[in-house]
């Protein structure tokens, strides 16, 4: 499927940092085909490998195992290999994730489990208007909370978790999934892991009030972007 098909022609959380500043860029973006680049291709490969590592660890707890190529075949992805630097980079990403766990868990043996990976969801406001989609890289249950996670493999630091519009838009989608599936949670942590950027992962926390505000703010961004007269 093309990006347009997957997103159903709606604004996507990954662009919310830009759309919040320039709503009209959504219409311009739709009229211009996506340009592939070496960096984008590497980003896709690294995201797939991280998904594989998370699912592999999850399966190992159930006594199952599968290879990288088994994973690629199951997703109908083209065969691909990582070089040594890329494998090391993904290892660093996992270590940064462990740092996030240690930061937010009250005690070492607290409940931590994978809920889903690379899941795209949609959120709509049928009263005020506005609709968007977003895809997290991973969603976890962490003790009595949730953790929504985004990997960034670029060499330039992105906005901190607290100021990140993409994460802000993903949080209501995580809450939506939890509510639909009966997952009880007190709040939602949101984290950005950037293994090519120095320092620990960036983490923030949303309580119920902040989750509701994030939903309103994100739908407002989508609403403005979908306005045909947006500047």
Question: What are the residue ranges of the model-derived segments?
Answer:
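Metal-dependent nuclease catalytic cores that hydrolyze phosphodiester bonds in DNA/RNA
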Residues: 1-145, 187-189
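Mg2+/Mn2+-dependent nuclease catalytic core
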Residues: 110-229
């Amino acid at each position: 499927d093309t990006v347009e098909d997957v997103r159903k022609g709606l604004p996507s959380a990954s662009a919310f940092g830009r759309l919040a500043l320039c709503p009209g860029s959504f219409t311009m973006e739709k009229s211009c085909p996506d340009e592939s680049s070496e960096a984008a291709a590497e980003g896709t490969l690294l995201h797939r490998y991280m998904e594989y590592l998370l699912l592999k660890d999850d399966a190992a707890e159930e006594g199952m195992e599968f290879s990288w190529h088994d994973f690629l075949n199951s997703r109908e992805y083209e065969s691909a290999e990582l070089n040594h630097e890329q494998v090391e980079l993904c290892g660093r990403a996992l270590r940064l994730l462990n740092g996030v766990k240690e930061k937010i868990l009250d005690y070492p043996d607290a409940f931590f489990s994978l809920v889903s990976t690379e899941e795209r969801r949609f959120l709509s406001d049928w009263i005020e208007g506005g609709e968007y989609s977003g895809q997290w890289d991973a969603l976890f249950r962490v003790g009595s909370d949730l953790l929504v996670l985004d990997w960034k493999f670029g060499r330039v630091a992105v906005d901190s978790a607290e100021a990140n519009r993409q994460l802000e838009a993903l949080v209501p989608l995580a809450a939506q999934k939890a509510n639909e599936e009966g997952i009880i949670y007190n709040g939602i942590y949101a984290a950005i892991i950037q293994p090519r950027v120095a320092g620990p992962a960036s983490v923030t926390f949303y309580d119920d009030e902040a989750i509701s505000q994030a939903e309103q703010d994100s739908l407002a961004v989508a609403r403005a972007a979908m306005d045909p007269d947006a500047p």
